[in-house]
Amino acid sequence: SGLDEAGWLAPSAAEGWSISDVMLHLAQSEEAVVSSVTGAQISLLDSIPVVGDTVDEIMENRVRAERGDPFVIFERWRTARRASVAALRNADPDARFPWAAAPLRPQAMATTRLAEHWAHALDIAEPLGVDYPDTDRLRHIAWLAHRTLPYGFGLAGDQPQPIYCELEAPSGDTWTYGDPAAPA
């Protein structure tokens, strides 16, 4: 990684979390994928009580419960990431596995992992002054964002409705999601 201990313990852009805390959160979420898909417990995560009223509060409490040596946490993330990729690759593509908002198929769960890693990479790169340019790989995150709009509407207490999105990709290409006849 190239970071020394001071770098790992520096504040991230995720309020209240160090860069090491962000990596711990990512490690925990990858371990949760493995647990969901395979039923195997690969960490102590399942033994940490679920405390909080929202996903954010639960994640905050889990990070707080497991803070530790940043170099160990980074290796934990690497191990969990490899296990998560293997679990999703080997899963029945039509099966649905429990996840935060609703059961997901492996492809959708993998896309959520891309989105979470992208968002948290920004939390890490920005405070370190590392350039993190947008690329057309963001299309997966755009797809996920459109796909989860009904969930977002529901959380806000609004009735989900079809929405058409037309986005300009970093390359200048146009990405479209939804029915063009739906409101934009």
Where are each of the predicted segments found?
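Hydrophobic, proline/glycine-rich low-complexity stretches
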Residues: 1-6
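Internal, conserved structured core segments that host functional sites
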Residues: 67-119
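Short, conserved, surface-exposed binding loops centered on an aromatic residue
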Residues: 153-159, 166-167
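Conserved active-site beta-strand-loop modules that form the wall/rim of enzyme catalytic pockets
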Residues: 116-117, 162-165
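Short, contiguous alpha-helical
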Residues: 9-50, 99-156
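Short secondary-structure transition/capping segments
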Residues: 50-62, 90, 135-148, 178-183
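Short, helix-capping/interhelical loops that line the mouth of catalytic, cofactor-
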Residues: 31-89
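Low-complexity, glycine/alanine/valine/leucine- and proline-rich hydrophobic stretches
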Residues: 164-184
